[in-house]
Amino acid sequence: DHGRAPLDGIDFPGGNYLSMCGKYTASDNILTDYHESLMYKEYGDVFFLTHFPYNTSPFWNMKKSPIKGSTGDEVALKCDVIMGGMETIGSAERADDVDMMREQFHTISNGDYAQLLYNLFDKKRVLKELDEFLQFDFIPRFGGGIGVTRMISAMRLAGLM
């Protein structure tokens, strides 16, 4: 027993990305690993970070919220789980609108993402593969990832291992 309650009925703390930027006076409204460590110190082992401004993690197949953020900014439908002061789990809803995905592919990071791929693989090849991919029918879905070594570190910090 580590002095922790069982998970049933527990509400984990969480916060809106821009609210946390304001709280921790994050430069340029960008949270860093330093800010994640502050969340750990203040809120404990697990913290859900939500309502990311789209520009903080633009990705061409990430879905945008139909509702704008408090400052009128576009919001990505994603969340990060901060465990032990580290971003450990990331999840986001994926886009299912082919036209929007194509537009985002060409415009995210002011077109630099597409240009990087053109430089690495040849523009003709990249556009051919993009067209082939976008021919599929897309259903509402999500994707995510877990940093296993970070999760192990967080579990050790929490006394669970």
Task: Tell what function each PLM region has.
Residues 2-161:
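A translation/RNA-centric and nucleic-acid-associated enzymatic feature enriched
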